[in-house]
Regions:
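Extracellular interaction modules
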Residues: 19-23, 83-86, 277-286, 381-385, ...
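Extracellular repeat-rich scaffold modules on cell surfaces
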Residues: 1-14, 20-22, 26-78, 86-148, ...
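Extended hydrophobic-aromatic, low-complexity segments
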Residues: 127, 207-209, 255
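Extracellular beta-strand/loop-rich repeat segments of large surface/secreted proteins
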Residues: 44, 108, 154-241, 471, ...
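Extracellular, surface-exposed passenger/stalk and repeat segments of large secreted bacterial proteins
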Residues: 16, 80, 144, 158, ...
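Residue-level signature of catalytic and energy-coupling elements of molecular machines
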Residues: 151
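Extracellular/surface-exposed low-complexity segments
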Residues: 201, 218-341
Length: 779
């Protein structure tokens, strides 16, 4: 019993083997193992330079002072319940929770293989050494303010900032920062084969560790709770997080040799990896999410691969960083087998590539949508598209595209596809202009064009084209559209020749033709045609133009039959007819017609030809009335008149006229028929003068003469003549009238001889004979 003053024990046996009740001061100036239990209200002082071990279950309350040597506590009760003033060395060789407050200038050593928790608000200034077991600090001041030398295991596990001078983790040691804890140190040293473990949660602030003077890194970094500080569902590479683990005021020396990461959301896309690295300033060690594409190069925790698997059909991810070849940095032991140069898009979601990428190994789209926002986005390799490739860009895209998938052109720019493509899933143009520079550019599938499709190429384009958009033919080549097309936005021909091999080839919209439109087909083409270009009809089919057309470049008929159902059908330019032009319409057709072909007038309407025509293939009138307003109107060929030919003109009409139809002379001009004509339908003279220069000029039918018929010929004219008009015999030849004529307008003989072989031959009117009248008849 110590009731007053100080009792000094100079050896561990000095107090015998019984319990000690210390109500004053017990000074232990000795070394060894003191196993006596100490109770009471007094204090214990360790003096001298020896090492003393207290192993009793002590309950004294007056505190402990270590003024010299080493005091070893081999259980957490060994120092009673009072504060500890440590000005030498306190060694805690025990497990459990030690909550006595420790102050003083001395050092604390944790020894043994047990786990010890320091929970006190400690102020000691000496170093802390962990030589064995695990030391857990559950108060931010538990380790005092001195340097820490960790040779075993240290856990800082309190919400808030631990402040120490130096923290060194020796080889084989592990320093762990608990979730919510941070550390402020003068220096941080992680030696080779050491481990730094950082546990993160949503309350963890960065940086987790700040060192004001120096950071030296080696060994292993283990990180948990990553998902609490990094976004596991980023929308783009711009959203990939950076969280600072270690910050230094000076350049960090060394680096961790190994990194392990745990606690990331299981839904984190496998194309994103978590990586730890020293930043470009060299002063921060950061935890980042990055593309797995670069994992091996950056020593990330996963093996690098080039697969982007977006499983959510409504989800998307935008890559704004450049994807380049990384084959030289790949781990040869990687299980992925990736070549480091190719990209694979999987899953139902959308991957957006925004950078000008340089990878060379090709792109495979096996699911969802891959969006390229520039023409370099898919690198330089071929594209295998088995889902959807969306090109939201302008420029020239020359990568070859194959596969069963679709290509979509979006955005308002002009994009040219120049590759020899074989994809079969079709093409959708939703905006802007898509230019095909060869007929294979759009693969083999149908095209849905809701904007502008420009075909700057020659050859045969047999893809079916639908949609509400416009098709443009540009360039100097000849392009054939052979598909059964339904697009409604119209067609523009700005260069070369566009050949339509069926009447649906140009869809249902208007055609603006500023070059050459060739229609190599039969059927009814009712699209309206405008522009300065030429229309050509080729092929042996019969084609009908039924639109109200305004094109000015002329029409060429090379083969077959071209039917015009209106006088506007052939625009306003000249017609070169080298086959058959059928005019099944009425009205005034003023276009000039040339060529070696034939003109046919069909239908029951009245059509006027007023052009100065030179066609040589003849004219067929199968229905209605064909009016010629000049003697060149029917070209130079024969006329087969099976309906009505009206000649409303003057001059010399030398074309031969045959057929079963009628010829009408109208107008007040003088017209001469000089052909050897065989038409049988009769002749009507309603105005002016009709001159016949041979007895066959008026065919074989009756003549209804209500104006003037001039017969300037010789021979036997046996056509019956009726009407109110006059008959004039001119010329010096002898003409015989042998018909039974009833005309009433009289007869004028101005030259030659007129022979009447019957008393009706000269009709009923007066005869003015200024030459010779021979009456070779009786009656």
């Amino acid at each position: 019993l110590i009731s007053d003053g100080t009792l000094v024990a100079s050896n561990v046996e000095a107090l015998g083997s019984g319990d000690v009740t210390d109500n004053a001061t017990l000074e232990m100036n000795t070394g060894g193992d003191f196993a006596n239990n100490i109770g009471g209200t007094g204090s214990v002082v360790k003096s001298g330079d020896k090492t003393l071990t207290l192993s009793g279950a002590n309950s004294y309350t007056g505190g402990t002072t270590i003024s010299g040597g080493t005091l070893v506590a081999n259980n957490v009760e060994a120092l009673g319940t009072g504060d500890v003033t440590n000005n030498a060395t306190l060694e805690l060789n025990t497990g459990g929770t030690f909550d006595n407050a420790i102050s003083g200038s001395g050092q604390v050593v944790k020894s043994g293989d047990e786990t010890l928790t320091l929970s006190g608000n400690n102020t000691y200034r000496g170093a802390t050494t962990i030589s064995g077991g695990t030391l857990i600090a559950t108060h931010v001041n538990a380790l005092g303010t001195g340097a820490i030398d960790n040779r075993a295991s240290l856990l800082l596990d309190a919400s808030g900032q631990f402040t120490v001078t130096d923290l060194t983790t020796e080889s084989g040691g592990n320093t762990e920062i608990g979730a919510g804890s941070t550390l402020q140190a003068t220096t941080l040293t992680q030696k080779s084969d050491s481990t730094l473990t950082i546990n993160l949660d949503s309350n963890t602030a960065d940086p987790v560790i700040h060192a004001a003077s120096q950071v030296s890194l080696a060994g292993t970094l283990d990180i948990t709770g990553v998902g609490d500080v990094l976004d596991s569902d980023p929308a783009s590479t711009d959203d990939l997080d950076t969280f600072t683990l270690i910050a230094s005021d000076k350049t960090i020396a060394g680096d961790f040799e190994k990194l392990t990461v745990a606690g990331m959301d299981a839904d984190l896309a496998d194309f994103i990896t978590v990586d730890g690295r020293i930043d470009d300033t060299g002063k921060q060690y950061e935890l980042t999410t990055a593309l797995t594409w670069y994992a091996d190069r950056d020593d990330a925790v996963t093996d690098a691969h080039g697969t982007f698997n977006l499983t959510n059909a409504d989800g998307s991810f935008a890559v704004n960083t450049v994807l380049e070849n990384v084959d030289a940095t790949l781990d040869p032991a990687s299980a992925t087998g990736w070549d480091g140069t190719s990209l694979i898009k999987q899953g139902a979601g959308t991957l957006i590539l925004n950078a000008e990428n340089t990878y060379t190994g090709g792109t495979t789209i096996s699911g969802g949508t891959l969006v390229a926002t520039n023409v370099e986005a898919l690198g330089s390799g071929d594209v295998t598209d088995d889902a959807t490739l969306e090109l939201n860009t302008g420029g020239t895209f020359d990568n070859a595209i194959s596969g069963s998938g679709q290509v979509v052109k979006s955005g308002d720019k002009m994009l040219t596809l120049s590759g020899a493509n074989s994809y079969s899933g079709g093409t959708l143009i939703s905006d802007g202009t898509l230019v095909a520079s060869n007929v294979e550019s759009l693969g083999t599938g149908d095209v849905t064009n809701n904007a502008t499709l420009e075909l700057n190429t020659g050859g045969t384009f047999d893809n079916a084209i639908g949609g509400s958009g416009n098709v443009v033919k540009s360039g100097a080549d000849t392009l054939t559209l052979s598909g059964s097309n339904s697009y409604t936005g119209g067609t523009t021909i700005s260069g070369g020749t566009l050949v339509a091999s069926n009447v649906e080839a140009l869809g249902t919209g208007d055609v603006t033709n500023n070059a050459v439109l060739e229609l190599n087909t039969g059927g009814d083409f009712d699209n309206a045609i405008s522009g300065s270009g030429q229309v050509e009809k080729s092929g042996d089919g019969t084609l009908t133009l039924s639109g109200s057309n305004t094109y000015t470049g002329g029409t060429t008929i090379n083969d077959g039959t071209l039917i015009a159902t209106s006088v506007e059908a052939l625009g306003t330019g000249d017609v070169t007819d080298n086959a058959t032009l059928a005019l099944n319409t009425g009205g005034d057709f003023i276009n000039n017609i040339g060529g070696t072909g034939r003109v046919e007038k069909s239908g029951d309407e009245t059509l006027t030809l007023s052009g100065s025509n030179t066609y040589t293939g003849g004219t067929l009138i199968s229905g209605g009335t064909l009016v010629a307003t000049n003697v060149e109107a029917l070209g130079t060929g024969d006329v087969t008149d099976n309906a009505v030919l009206e000649l409303n003109t003057g001059g010399d009409f030398i074309n031969n006229i045959g057929g079963t139809g009628r010829v009408e002379k109208s107008g007040d001009d003088t017209l001469t028929l000089s052909g050897t004509n065989s038409y049988t339908g009769g002749t009507t003279i309603s105005g002016g003068t009709l001159v016949a220069t041979n007895v066959d000029a008026l065919g074989t039918g009756d003549v209804t003469n209500n104006a003037t018929l001039e017969l300037n010929t010789g021979g036997d004219f046996d056509n019956a003549i009726s009407g109110s008009g006059q008959v004039v015999k001119s010329g010096d030849e002898t003409l015989t009238l042998s018909g039974s004529n009833t005309y009433t307008g009289g007869t004028l003989i101005s030259g030659g001889t007129l022979v009447a072989t019957n008393v009706e031959a000269l009709g009923t009117g007066d005869v003015t004979d200024n030459a010779t009248l021979a009456l070779n008849t009786g009656g």
